[in-house]
């Protein structure tokens, strides 16, 4: 391999990242900035220049697919020796198996069906309350990722504002039962593999020496998603060494709810004195118009705004629909309209915030004979609580009993993802009843399977149906976002500043999956179980609407208020007095709604109101950051504040 040849075709920042002589390197790689290309070329460049031996490289990725892609790219670059690449769990398991073999230790059984195992240790009193094993498993996984023991779980969960369907001490009790049952059966789960590997690196000096001799140069991808358990294992591998390169993007940190801690990326230079940081901000994926929308979603001051390199494309669209069913049908029509001759169905994807949204969209795609594929476990029928509910149907009961049971399950699950999924199933149960004169549980199962089944050719060319989280790392020429409403984007249970910031980043991730065209949709009404609820557009859509209007007419300006409607001149308070009053009003509204102040209005919007001193709703609508939804909701109060404090 030629080191200089490996720098060809890279931009200046990428060259710095690939050729940096620093042993400790942090690469802040924005969406679509070519991070995998840079990571593989850095490994290959260091090998070509003699600063590392590929046989002693450990490259950690977050998926098996990413590990495979990294290995293939290194081979294509001419690297003769294969590097060790894999997920934390895969690498830890390989190391442990070697140790167990060398020490003649009988390996424990690795538990691969955690939900079923937890279900067997759940007290009957919990299952009667409609709490599923899946709810408990999520908390156990969060606790283990954060290095929290069962006894410490209640305090840790309270400190982290965890939303749990049952009381925290009961979760801790089930957590302890789960750990005891595993010990009794000599079983370990995937998180235990990391814990055991870290323990053995700390306690077994011979094992640690062998591991540290083998792994001398560390590369970690998606470092913003590392959790404390993974970070502690990385520390154990490194010991007192600092030959480590991490790649991450703070604007794509979307897994704090699952235990991830982006502070490891933020604090990398403090952890590794002398480390260098290179920022990659040139985006090679999305059109300038899509990036403008993505950048407007980020928090002001967050940094990391992306710079476009691709040609211009169409301005993203924002569409309102009467209800969620109309939204699903409109998305299906939009997909068919975008399916030009010679294009593939797989060039398009529908992204949703929650699994429960997929049912109506699957039905609409099915009715439109559009092949689709629910990636991973995105399909409603793949959700454990839905599978269990479907299995429980029948038993000679009437269909009315079936509906009643589903309604009871949905109500018991409350405002959770599980409740939303069961609510989607209940809605489908009512849909089935409207098409079958003699509905039965067995008939519903057959209809459900047919309605939500993948098309025959879905394994090949098919539209992808993916959640925002599952879409990370993927891209499509055309992306349709569904359900951009308050309560979904951001999700209803995101109430802290940190949770709302993560929801903002999640929308940013979803938007930056699009290469050429982006369509954003929301419904004015949405059905949850048996409840039909009015909806309001996501708080982010006002900024997006404003950005799209500017993109459509770069020279456009909102017309000033008509001179006939301007306030008469005369003595009045200084503008700051009005602004102070507006901010005080906003603070009170934010306290009552239990949200950060910027969710009500940005500072720049209040500054515009204070400067313009509007007297009518029309004058409010002429100001930046004020659309019809917010004027209808807050307009009268804004005008009262201005009238009271404006002199």
Which residues are covered by each model-predicted region?
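P-loop NTPase Walker
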Residues: 1-108, 209, 239, 292-295, ...
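Helicase P-loop NTPase motor core of nucleic-acid translocases
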Residues: 1-33, 37-49, 148-155, 163-166, ...
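Conserved helicase NTPase motor core
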Residues: 3, 8-19, 23-28, 38, ...
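Helicase P-loop NTPase motor core
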Residues: 27, 31-43, 273-276, 281-372, ...
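Conserved P-loop NTPase-based nucleic-acid remodeling module centered on helicase motor cores
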Residues: 54-139, 144-148, 152, 369, ...
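Conserved helicase C-terminal RecA-like lobe
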Residues: 164, 217, 344, 358-370, ...
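C-terminal accessory/binding modules appended to enzymatic or scaffolding proteins
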Residues: 568-615
């Amino acid at each position: 391999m030629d080191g200089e040849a490996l720098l060809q075709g890279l931009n200046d920042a990428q060259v710095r990242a690939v050729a940096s002589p620093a042993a400790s390197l942090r690469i802040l790689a924005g969406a679509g900035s070519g991070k995998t290309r840079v990571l593989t070329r850095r490994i290959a460049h260091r090998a070509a220049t003699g600063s590392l031996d590929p046989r002693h490289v450990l490259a950690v990725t977050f998926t098996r697919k990413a590990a495979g892609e990294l290995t293939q790219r290194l081979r294509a670059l001419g690297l003769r020796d294969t590097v060790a690449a894999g997920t934390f769990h895969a690498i830890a398991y390989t190391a442990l198996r070697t140790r167990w073999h060398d020490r003649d230790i009988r390996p424990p059984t690795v538990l691969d069906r955690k939900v079923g195992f937890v279900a067997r240790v759940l007290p009957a009193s919990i299952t009667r309350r409609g709490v599923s094993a899946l709810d408990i498993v999520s908390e156990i996984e969060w606790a283990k990722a954060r290095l929290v023991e069962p006894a410490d779980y209640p305090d840790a969960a309270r400190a982290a504002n965890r939303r749990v369907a049952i009381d925290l001490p009961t979760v801790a009790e089930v957590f302890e039962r789960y750990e005891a049952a595993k010990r009794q059966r000599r079983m370990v789960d995937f998180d235990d593999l990391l814990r055991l590997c870290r323990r053995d690196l700390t306690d077994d000096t011979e094992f640690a020496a062998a591991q540290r001799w083998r792994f001398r140069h560390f590369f970690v991808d998606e470092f913003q998603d590392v959790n404390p358990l993974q970070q502690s294992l990385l520390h154990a591998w490194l010991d007192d060494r600092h030959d480590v390169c991490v790649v991450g993007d703070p604007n794509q940190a979307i897994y704090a709810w699952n235990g991830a801690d982006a502070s490891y990326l933020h604090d990398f230079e403090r952890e590794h004195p002398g480390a260098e940081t290179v920022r990659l901000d040139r985006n090679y994926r999305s059109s300038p118009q899509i990036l403008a929308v993505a950048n407007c979603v980020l928090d002001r001051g967050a940094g990391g705004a992306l710079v476009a390199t691709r040609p211009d494309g169409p301005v993203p669209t924002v569409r309102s629909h009467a209800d969620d069913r109309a939204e699903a049908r409109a998305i299906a029509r939009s997909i068919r309209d975008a399916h030009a001759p010679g294009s593939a169905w797989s060039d398009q994807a529908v992204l949703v915030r929650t699994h429960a949204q997929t049912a109506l969209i699957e039905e609409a795609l099915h009715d439109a004979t559009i092949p689709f594929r629910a990636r991973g476990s995105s399909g409603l029928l793949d959700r454990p609580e839905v599978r269990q509910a479907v299995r429980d149907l029948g038993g000679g009961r009437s269909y009315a009993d079936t509906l009643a049971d589903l309604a009871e399950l949905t109500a018991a699950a409350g405002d959770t993802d599980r409740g939303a999924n069961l609510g989607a199933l209940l809605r489908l149960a009512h849909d089935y009843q409207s098409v079958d004169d003699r509905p039965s549980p067995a008939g519903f199962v057959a209809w459900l399977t047919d309605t939500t089944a993948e098309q025959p050719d879905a394994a090949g060319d098919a539209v992808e149906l993916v959640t925002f989280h599952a879409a990370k790392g993927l891209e499509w020429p055309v992306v349709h976002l569904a359900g951009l409403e308050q309560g979904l984007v951001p999700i209803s249970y995101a109430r802290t500043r940190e949770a709302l910031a993560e929801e903002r980043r999640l929308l940013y991730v979803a938007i930056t999956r699009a290469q050429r065209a982006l369509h954003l949709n929301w419904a004015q009404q949405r059905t949850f179980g048996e409840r039909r609820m009015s909806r309001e557009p996501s708080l982010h859509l006002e900024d997006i609407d404003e950005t799209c209007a500017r993109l459509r007419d770069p020279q456009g300006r909102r017309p000033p208020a008509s001179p006939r409607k301007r306030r008469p001149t005369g003595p009045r308070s200084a503008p700051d007095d009005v602004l102070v009053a507006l901010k005080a009003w906003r603070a009170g509204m934010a306290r009552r709604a239990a949200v950060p102040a910027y969710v009500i209005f940005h500072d720049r919007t209040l500054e515009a109101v204070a400067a313009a001193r509007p007297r009518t709703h029309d004058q409010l609508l002429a100001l930046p950051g004020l659309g019809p939804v917010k004027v209808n909701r807050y307009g009268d109060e804004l005008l009262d504040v201005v009238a009271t404090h404006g002199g």
